[in-house]
């Protein structure tokens, strides 16, 4: 896709939503990290429902450790993979306390050393908490980027690299939020709402001859 078309797409995203934010609800740096970890293979809605009562009382590494793994499971049992997520969160709390004075590190390499933290989680944290121009590739970003024509890769990591190369730096701070929200509400997995899509004239999928309009 030509750079001028990519710029036009993100100009439209920016005009329609100048300051996009994560839809995960959190109280501080630590609770955002926990929420993002819980969001793996789960919806933001389901995570917010589970963490509402959890974060009201347990919003620090020390408090989560006091709650314990079994106690944590009771709060997050409605979320997929809650057993392994609870185990990772408890292990993560211990490391944050011992190695980082309970603070969330602002370094990618340090973040991905933590239990349960992969590339996507690390990139979300760096972007949302520290304003870094990262590209967190979840299922929405992966699908939308390939459907629009922004990327061709067959893995999230390759798509991440492609997007970082093709998207102008001035858009990168908000780019992954725009792509997520576009995928969540318009460019849906099974049936994209092309009729209301603000970027359809630039979309390879929409302009494909095999697509009925």
Swiss-Prot record:
Keywords: 4Fe-4S, DNA damage, DNA repair, DNA-binding, Glycosidase, Hydrolase, Iron, Iron-sulfur, Lyase, Metal-binding. It comes from the Bacteria. This is Endonuclease III. The keyword DNA repair applies. Belongs to the Nth/MutY family. The keyword Manganese does not apply. It catalyses: 2'-deoxyribonucleotide-(2'-deoxyribose 5'-phosphate)-2'-deoxyribonucleotide-DNA = a 3'-end 2'-deoxyribonucleotide-(2,3-dehydro-2,3-deoxyribose 5'-phosphate)-DNA + a 5'-end 5'-phospho-2'-deoxyribonucleoside-DNA + H(+). Pfam families: EndIII_4Fe-2S, HHH, HhH-GPD. GO terms for biological process: base-excision repair, AP site formation. One of its GO terms (molecular function) is 4 iron, 4 sulfur cluster binding. Binds 1 [4Fe-4S] cluster.
